[in-house]
Amino acid sequence: MSISNYRLQTRVRLQPLVLFQIIAAYERRPKTAKMAVGTLLGRRDRCNDIIEITNSYTVQHKEQQIGDMEQFKLDTQYASEMFELNQVTYPQEKIIGWYCTGKTLSRSAAALHGYYSRECGDMQPLHLLVDTSLRGGRLTTRLYCAVTMGVPGGTRGLLFTLLPLLKVNAEGDEAVALRLMQKQALHPTKQLGRMLPELVHVMEATRELEQKLDLVMRYINDVLTRKRRPDNSIGRALHDALTSVPLLDADSFRAMFNANVRNMLMSITLSSMIKTQMELSEKLSYLPDH
C-alpha cells in the first residue's frame, strides 16, 4: 500500500473545540500518565490541499519504564469503539491522525504513527503536539507529518517534519464563545472564577445590536439627506439583511422571545446538573475500593 506524503502547501484548519478537548483530556488524565493521547477526526478535500480538524477523543494508554526502555501500549479496542460511536453521530468525520501533550515528540511517536497509518488508509496521519505547560502564557501547538526516508533497498525510517501552516478556524458560535472568553480574561468580574450570568450576556449582545442599528440608521439618514454618497454594495447588504428577518407583529415577537428565554434557562439548569453529576462521579472514582 502506497502512502502519499503531505505537501508543504497543505493548509490545516483547527477548530478551537479540539484544543479544549485536549486540555480537558490532559487535566483528567490518570495520575500515573505523563501525557494525554487521543485520535484526531476531521475532513479533507479530494486534492488534499485543505484539511480541517473538527473533533477528537481520548484514547486510554499505559506507559511503563523498564530500565532504559520505555514501553507504550495503546488501548486499540477502546479507540475502535469510540470511533464507531462517533460515526453514528458524525459519519462525515474520518480519522486523520492523533494528538499528544508535551513539549517535544515522545519516543512513542513512531509506534503511534504505525497504528494510525493503518487507521487513516492511504493517507499519512497528522500528529498534533500540544504543550499544555503554557510557557510564556501561551498554548503552543505544533503539527507534524512523518516523511519516509532511507537508502533504497536498505533500512527505512521516519522523519517528523513540521507542517508550516496551522490555522485556527473560528466561525459562528465558536467565534462568539471565544470573544466572550477573551473579554472575561481582559476584564474579569469581581467574583473571580465565575462567568457572568447568561442573561447578562443577552443584555450585552442586545446593547451591541442597538449600537449597530444606530450606526446603520445614521448611514441611511446621511444618504437620504445627501451628506454621504450611496454605496450599492452596502445597500444590497442591508436589503439582504432586512429581507432575511421574518415580519412579525409585536405580540408574536414577544411570545417567541419569551419561549427562547425559557428554553435557555432550562438548558442552563440541565447543564448545571450534568456538571455537578460529573464532578461527583470524578471524585467518587478516586475513592479506594473496600
From Swiss-Prot:
Pfam families on file: JAB, MitMem_reg
Localization terms from the record: Cytoplasm
Domain MPN: 12-150
An annotated GO cellular component: eukaryotic 48S preinitiation complex
UniProt cross-references to InterPro entries, sorted A to Z: eIF3f (IPR027531), EIF3F/CSN6-like_C (IPR024969), JAMM/MPN+_dom (IPR000555), MPN (IPR037518)
Top-level taxon of origin: Eukaryota
Major subcellular location class: cytoplasm
Keywords: Cytoplasm, Initiation factor, Protein biosynthesis
GO biological process: formation of cytoplasmic translation initiation complex
MF term (GO), any: translation initiation factor binding
Subunit structure as annotated in this protein's UniProt entry: Component of the eukaryotic translation initiation factor 3 (eIF-3) complex. The eIF-3 complex interacts with pix.
Family designation: Belongs to the eIF-3 subunit F family.
UniProt xrefs under PANTHER family: EUKARYOTIC TRANSLATION INITIATION FACTOR 3 SUBUNIT F (PTHR10540:SF6), EUKARYOTIC TRANSLATION INITIATION FACTOR 3 SUBUNIT F-RELATED (PTHR10540)
Function in brief: Component of the eukaryotic translation initiation factor 3 (eIF-3) complex, which is involved in protein synthesis of a specialized repertoire of mRNAs and, together with other initiation factors, stimulates binding of mRNA and methionyl-tRNAi to the 40S ribosome. The eIF-3 complex specifically targets and initiates translation of a subset of mRNAs involved in cell proliferation.
HAMAP family hit by this protein: eIF3f
The name this protein goes by in its record: Eukaryotic translation initiation factor 3 subunit F-2
Gene: eIF3f2
